[in-house]
Amino acid sequence: MEREKEQFRKLFIGGLSFETTEESLRNYYEQWGTLTDCVVMRDPASKRSRGFGFVTFSCMNEVDAAMATRPHTIDGRVVEPKRAVAREESAKPGAHVTVKKLFVGGIKEDTEEHHLREYFEEYGKIDSIEIITDKQSGKKRGFAFVTFDDHDPVDKIVLQKYHTINGHNAEVRKALSKQEMQDVQNTRNNRGGNFGFGDSRGGGNFGSGPGGNFRGGSDGYGGGRGYGDNGYNGYGGGQGGGNYGGGPSYGGGRGGGYGGGAGYGNQGGGYGGGYDNYGGGNYGGGGNYNDFGNYNQQSSNYGPMKSGGNFGGNRSMGGGPYGGGNYGPGNASGGNGGGYGGRNRY
């Protein structure tokens, strides 16, 4: 029987005691299944634990079983298990944010709340479902929000980008609230704009390609090499990828990509800054999802950034409130600097 892809079987374990070894980590997680890999990430020079590691199970059901029995305590310390983020996703802003709300795009006019509930309740307990409609016409705008009682269902769902709901392909993303978007704005203002998400050697901008407003210099968020070893580059963010997050970033470099604290930004843009160019249109203002209109007319908590005030480049992908670039990782034209605290995260 062919084994499931590693990304579905792998857990990131943060908050480890510095005394925790691979043996004690393995012994703890083997209670839920067979481990095919177990590692505590260490500083290459001092060999001291960096306080996080990875465990890979033989199947996703074992991951589900482990996550269903949180909290986990190892060597007297409560640790933070999360489903690992694949390399190609880890550099995207928001990939490491812990949220309970899911954005579902691409749903069709004939999709009702019960279709969404029937599909997503298999992943976890649902608190609410909101299908967004146009306030004036009442017409569905092609996307919805599903809120769970825990972050793990969202983490599990977004491991697979597309889901077939009511016979149609829908795209899923983590959803951020207005407050979380505002936190990004505030951080930008506080730091004077001298930073970038950076998806290429620590530079980067808050935009989709050339012309971004916020070039990354030596203080760039997500720059540098980050933590991690080459053996784990399958879950890194590329050189200088990384997340835009608080706390010590667990990654963003060759082996990390697992941001600590609360990262900000929607994964790849989401409904915020261009829907990741999905379909070539700016979500909420142009050529995507039946041209459902501008999101800024909605009263939802998941509201808009003002036009021109979003974190984007010079180009607009559509006519909506998010014109101004994709809220995704930039192509990094500014600087080769390091991560949040300096040029090198080692």
UniProtKB/Swiss-Prot annotation:
Composition bias type Gly residues, residue spans: 193-217
InterPro entries: hnRNPA2B1_RRM1, Nucleotide-bd_a/b_plait_sf, RBD_domain_sf, RRM_dom
CC annotations in GO: catalytic step 2 spliceosome
Keywords: Nucleus, Repeat, Ribonucleoprotein, RNA-binding
Stretch list, region Nuclear targeting sequence: 297-340
One of the GO biological process terms: mRNA splicing, via spliceosome
Pfam families linked: RRM_1
Region (Disordered): 182-217, 326-346
Compartment(s) where it occurs, according to its Swiss-Prot or TrEMBL record: Nucleus
Residue ranges constituting the RRM domain according to the UniProt record: 9-92, 100-179
Any GO MF annotation of the entry: mRNA 3'-UTR binding
Described purpose of this protein according to its UniProt entry: Forms complexes (ribonucleosomes) with at least 20 other different hnRNP and heterogeneous nuclear RNA in the nucleus.
PANTHER family the UniProt entry points to: HETEROGENEOUS NUCLEAR RIBONUCLEOPROTEINS A2_B1 (PTHR48026:SF13), HOMOLOGOUS TO DROSOPHILA SQD (SQUID) PROTEIN (PTHR48026)
Name assigned to this protein: Heterogeneous nuclear ribonucleoprotein A2 homolog 1
